[in-house]
Amino acid sequence: MSNQELKTTMSKSIEAAQRNFNTIRTGRANTSLLDRISVEYYGAETPLKSLATITTPDSQTIAIQPFDLGSLASIEKAIATSDLGFTPNNDGKIIRINVPPLTEERRKEFCKLASKYAEEGKVALRNIRREAIDRVKKSEKDGDLSEDQSRDEQETIQKETDNFIKDIEKKLSEKEAEILKV
């Protein structure tokens, strides 16, 4: 695995962690809160964002305007039964969701969830590091790399891993600050 391939693979783990962070409520309306919602539409689970236009008219409201008004009830049901805790308001054309301010208790829960997502990202990075180091050790064992080259490669891999872990920790602290901001 080249250094560039390693960075690309690790970047994908960072992006996955960031996507997870984006699904955490912060007390402000954000369209990415609805990214994980799937709607039963003509017998198939369909992502909400492919069935409707999702906008944030103000900082406390999310508006969902379906392309097909026949899907309105299904969208409303999917939002109501999701784990987000939102109550959708259906006016026959648009579904509005009021995003209530977070209580202190909910803020702490969301910080724990963000920490969990960060830890999952770090574990993924460590697994990538382990695989890369195993490949280097195998190359050394097969005689493709000298002992010094192997050590240098392993140090480079470790430095890259450390940089990416710092990146996740930075994103986590930013998300926690955003969650705790009243």
UniProtKB/Swiss-Prot annotation:
Instruction: Note down the stretches annotated as region Disordered.
Output: 136-160
What is one GO biological process annotated to this record?
translational termination
Q: Which UniProt keywords apply?
A: Cytoplasm, Protein biosynthesis
Q: Which InterPro entries match?
A: Ribosome_recyc_fac, Ribosome_recyc_fac_dom, RRF_sf
Question: GO terms for molecular function, please?
Answer: ribosomal large subunit binding
Record's PANTHER family?
A: MITOCHONDRIAL RIBOSOME RECYCLING FACTOR PSEUDO 1 (PTHR20982:SF3), RIBOSOME RECYCLING FACTOR (PTHR20982)
Its name, as the record gives it, is Ribosome-recycling factor
Encoding gene, per UniProt annotation: frr
